[in-house]
Each structure stands twice: as C-alpha cells, then as structure tokens.
C-alpha cells in the first residue's frame, strides 16, 4: 500500500503552452469563462497551462477552460473562490497534473430518473492544515534531507495536520459526530533523532462542536482554536499519521479504521478503488451518496519525480452540478474549492485512474439519539423546526445529520419531518 503524503512546500509552477491542433481561440475561451462566471466583474486570464487557461473574475470566482476543441469546454470553475497560481494546495495540484495527462471525454451527467439534477455543496467549513488546526500536533525537527533537490523547509512551531486528518476533521464536523471517541491509540514520532510516543485517550475527550467555526480566516478565540485543534490532532493520531516536517502521511485503510473504531462511524463503510469500476458506475456512486446527503471522502495520488516519492492527497467531494462537475473541498483553507471534472481522470500518462479511491457508506453509526436534530440531547418541537430550516436552506450548521435521518433510510428529506412528528406524537 502506498503512503499518502501531503507536500506542503511545493508550489505549482506555470508552464509554457504549446501549439495545439484545433485549439480554441483565446476569444472563445474568454467568452466561455465569462458565461460560466456571470456578470459579477471583469474576467481576465491569469494563468496558462498545457491545454487549458485559467480566468479570474474581479468580484471573485474563476474558471479553467480547455484549449483543445475535443475536451469539455469548462474543466473547473468556482463561483466565488480565488485562484492563486502560486498556491501549494496539494489536492488541487494533483487534479491539475492529472487533467493535463488525461484524454478528455464527455461528462457523465446525473440520471434524472435516479438523482437530483444537482446537489449544492454540503460542506460549509474552510479548514486547512496550518493555524489553528495544527496547534496540538507535535513539533518535529527531523525530516528527510531534501536539500539536494533544492527544497528547504523552515522551522515551524507545530507540524501540519496532514491532508487525510484534515479531511476527516471536516467530515466529522459536517455530522457533528461523535461527542467523544472510543478507545485509545499511540503513534511514534522522531524528535532529535529519538523516538517519542504520542498517545490519545479518545474516551476521555469531548469534542466541542459548538466552539468550532466554519471559517477561521476572520479570527478566533483561544477556545475556538483549541476546539478544532483537538479534533484535528485526534484524527491524525487515530489514523496513525507518519509525520515529518514535509507533511503528514497515512493510508486509506488507516483513515477508514480510525473513523469506524475510534469515531463510531458505520462499520460497513469501505474504500473503493477506481480501476475496479467502469466510468459510469463510479460517477453514479458519487451522485448516489451525495443525493442521500452524505459527502464523499476521496483520495488521489501521483509521483513527485524530483523527490522520488509517491504523493497522496485526501479531499472531500460534497456536491455536483447539472453538467457533471463535482464540487470539491480541497481542505486548503477554502482555496480553489469549486466544481471540477473528476470523470475525465480515467486514463493518463501516469494512469491516474489506478490512483483514485473513495469512501462509501461512511456516516455515523446508529448509536445516536434519533430525532435530536439540534444536538441538545432532547427530542422536541425545536428539532422539527431545525430540520425544516435545514431542508429549506441547505445549511447544515448546527444540524446533527445522523440524528436527522429519522426514518433510517440513509437520506435526510421531507419524509424525516413526517417521521419526526410521528415520533413526538407517540412518545
């Protein structure tokens, strides 16, 4: 199995665009970007890559448009996100490398007889791996010697969380589950060339969901910072993260086992590998999970040839649009979050289809108070109000989605309102 590492210091470099046979004109590409971004501000081209260009809107938002006529016109877009060509967002850079090497094809649209035409993004958090998320992670002064590759990493107060634990933390905050973990776990890290054992007793911890913020960029109190730092650190230890200052790495199996054994998620959850499924089946499994209100933890990996290691990335797919693009939360403080073509990444020069996986049926187990939608430990009329507000707005902040699935069919919808009212009338 391949160790997943999130490189934190390797920025994306801009590449010279070659001449492409049958390439779209710049004017046409600019017009396409303008249509998808709307009229919120002036649209300008900010980056060029082989086969594609990136357009940014002054009022916020960006679009990545294909240069090759045979490719889908819009490969990715964000209605309000910012595109930074120097970003070291590892998940986004993985997608960028994969899409450049993939033979493009028509998108796989959601089947209207089985799925909604679109699902708005489920994840509201814009969390990452640095402050305050890494406050409880260890300080490590040991790392592989990368100076011969021209990579020099500065000292940091605490090691970064790692992309796997960061995705786990956002995922658990979405469900606001659990209140506390199960069992304990130890990991060994290296400090001053010595092994140091870190142990977490998950049973003794309480996760302070109410003091966690969806976005920490606007400032936070010590209590708010500590609440999310504890969750991230516990996720990292539970997943047996291997830390160096280069990043934090773990395995898909470790993440899955941590979610089941230490955080009480459904024990029938599993990790699927893309080569075992045809394109339509793969994408429709994503649509099905999202249409039931469950985000999809996703993984991708590639090779960093400079360093000579396989690099893994974990992120969350939490929505899709009517054109077959899925919404991705990269776990990088909101940077480049938006809609992306994942279906195209099936064959490439590095066989990116072999290097993709997703977690299915990963949601809280049944040991929650059914109907306690607002998470106050009681089931009453306020839970009905909270559930209706969620269904109307799509805003899951403060909503215990595990408890909101009152009828137990795996979907949170209007039938759960009826089931909740029946529950109140019969108890």
Name each region found by the language model:
Residues 19-23:
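Boundary at the C-terminal end of the N-terminal hydrophobic targeting segment
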Residues 1-5:
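Positively charged n-region of N-terminal signal peptides that target proteins for export
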Residues 6-18:
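Bacterial N-terminal signal peptides
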Residues 163, 259, 317-319, 328, ...:
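Residue-level detector of buried hydrophobic side-chain packing
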Residues 42-59, 257, 261-329:
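Active-site-adjacent substructure of cysteine-protease-like catalytic cores
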